Structures are given as structure tokens and as C-alpha cells.
């Protein structure tokens, strides 16, 4: 079965909480399978870490510091040959507010 590259939707999901991201990916893939469309993914991209170093004391002690980190997780889902029913059902999905979605046609 040959997959045409011209007619696909690429959905990029990003979140700071990986459990919310996994639930969102599962709902998108379930919706694609319900409308009988081929979906590929979720493809996990490497997590990005940002580490912030902050002084504990407001005045003197430079030796006393605290480190905080923020991890961002990303996944990609490709939907091939989407129908109008698939697009309508994807637009009506309730995705948690902590998940950022970017859609490319």
C-alpha cells in the first residue's frame, strides 16, 4: 500500500506534562481510526530540558543556589488521506489546556 505524501495532515503536540500529551495522542489516534483513516504515530521527539539556577539568599550567600528545570515533550502524528468527517471530528475534540497543538496540511 503506497502512501501519498501530498494529502496528509501533520499534527505536532507539545506539553510540559507527558501524561496529558499521551492522553491527547490517544484521543487523536482513536478519532482517526473511528473515521477509518490511516494514522501514523505518535512519533516521540526528544524532550528538551531548560535548567534555571537561582540564588537561595537575596543578599550574600552565592554558594547557596537552587536549580529548577522545565521539560517540554513533543510528539508528531501523521494522518494520511483525511476525509471531511475526519477533519470535523478532529476540530470537535476536547484537548486539555496544557497541550499545544500545531496542524500542518
UniProtKB/Swiss-Prot annotation:
Cited PANTHER family: 30S RIBOSOMAL PROTEIN S10 FAMILY MEMBER
Domain of life: Eukaryota
Family: Belongs to the universal ribosomal protein uS10 family.
Function: Involved in the binding of tRNA to the ribosomes.
Molecular-function annotations in GO: structural constituent of ribosome; tRNA binding
Pfam families noted in UniProt: Ribosomal_S10
Oligomeric form and interacting partners: Part of the 30S ribosomal subunit.
Compartments where located: Plastid, Chloroplast
Coiled-coil residues: none
Protein's name in the database: Small ribosomal subunit protein uS10c
